[in-house]
């Protein structure tokens, strides 16, 4: 709330406004922003922002950030990728085999945890664990390796 007893009201008409000689208390005396962290702001930066200045470690020029990206799915969750209609067809008609392309659903690797129903199926994936491969073949299915 404005009122007449504020200092700014009292100092109207006085050139320096209580900041000494003309030209003082203007602009950016310490520089703008993070200017001078190794010079005139050294103590503050070293105290409150340790590690801000200098190089740390080495650069990896040919770094592949997604090198180890390999989302996996267990055998127990494999049937959740199949629609209910396809499941019913596979249960009734034994001549039809279900094809599950795991990569289309966003997974790369099939792990061997869990059991499969006694329905043959073909699974396409980039990688299979030995137990997953064994259990899929026990049911009468097949494992197909897929490149991309």
Swiss-Prot record:
Listed GO CC annotations: cytosolic large ribosomal subunit
Ranges of biased composition (kind: Basic residues): 1-30
Organism: Euplotes crassus
PANTHER family found in the cross-reference section: 60S RIBOSOMAL PROTEIN L27A, LARGE RIBOSOMAL SUBUNIT PROTEIN UL15
Protein name per Swiss-Prot or TrEMBL: Large ribosomal subunit protein uL15
HAMAP family listed in its UniProt record: Ribosomal_uL15 (MF_01341)
Keyword presence, Oxidoreductase: no
GO molecular function, one term: structural constituent of ribosome
Superkingdom: Eukaryota
Upper classification of the organism: Eukaryota, Sar, Alveolata, Ciliophora, Intramacronucleata
Annotated keywords: Ribonucleoprotein, Ribosomal protein
An annotated GO BP: translation
